[in-house]
């Protein structure tokens, strides 16, 4: 029980950091609660992934126990990755995702407006995202189910409402194909590393990609079940 409490406390500390991102945006309470629940789950899976990786550092290549100094050095590298490098990127993503989820609740379902995809418009924008710039489609178009911003780590893209009579409609099939390209990057494993970003934070009431690798670590499903029971 003490181990479970320590585990839960560590996950909660990480969740508190991400919850700043959620609290910075105005949104309906139902949306806020759903996003906070997602943040808590993600934080728990992140904690589990870090501890699992750390546990594999205890032994050397021959299967013997590492000297403490060697283990501590390796652990510090893992800790820096998870709690500095990754955390910074994840927090910035959480801020953008929370803002976009909040905006989704404000978009009209009527016949007066369409939605338009816009980049930050500077030289830091990815070419694949530039090709999505200006995409204009109804809120009901399936494009927004998969390629609503943000579309990757450090993505600063935005979606706004525009009057229907001010901008021509985009070709849905063509921009969906461009969205697929923008979220495709085949890694060394042969898997698409960007496919996880094909979701809509506002429509699905999620902050983090549901297919994130943290959720695929050995034992992650048990952790998720434990966290859902002990929220």
Positions of predicted regions on the chain:
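Domain-core detector
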Residues: 1-152, 160-231
């Amino acid at each position: 029980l003490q181990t479970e409490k320590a585990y839960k406390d560590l996950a909660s500390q990480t969740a508190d950091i991400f919850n700043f991102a959620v609290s910075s945006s105005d949104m309906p309470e139902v949306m806020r609660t759903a996003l906070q629940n997602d943040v808590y789950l993600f934080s728990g899976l992140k904690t589990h992934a870090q501890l699992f990786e750390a546990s594999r550092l205890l032994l050397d290549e021959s299967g013997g126990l590492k000297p403490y100094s060697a283990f501590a050095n390796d652990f510090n590298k893992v800790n820096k990755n998870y709690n500095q490098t990754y955390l910074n990127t994840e927090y910035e993503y959480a801020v953008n995702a929370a803002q976009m989820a909040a905006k989704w609740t404000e978009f009209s379902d009527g016949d007066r407006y369409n939605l338009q995809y816009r980049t930050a418009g500077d030289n830091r924008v990815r070419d694949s995202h530039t090709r999505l710039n200006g995409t204009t489609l109804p809120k009901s178009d399936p494009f927004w189910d998969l390629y609503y911003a943000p579309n990757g780590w450090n993505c600063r893209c935005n979606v706004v409402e525009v009057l229907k009579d001010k901008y021509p409609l985009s070709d849905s099939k063509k921009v969906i194909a461009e969205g697929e390209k923008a979220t495709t990057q085949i890694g060394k494993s042969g898997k698409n590393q960007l496919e996880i970003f094909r979701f809509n934070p506002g429509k699905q009431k999620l902050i983090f990609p549901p297919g994130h690798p943290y959720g695929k670590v050995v034992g992650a499903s048990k952790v998720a079940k434990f966290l859902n029971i002990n929220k």
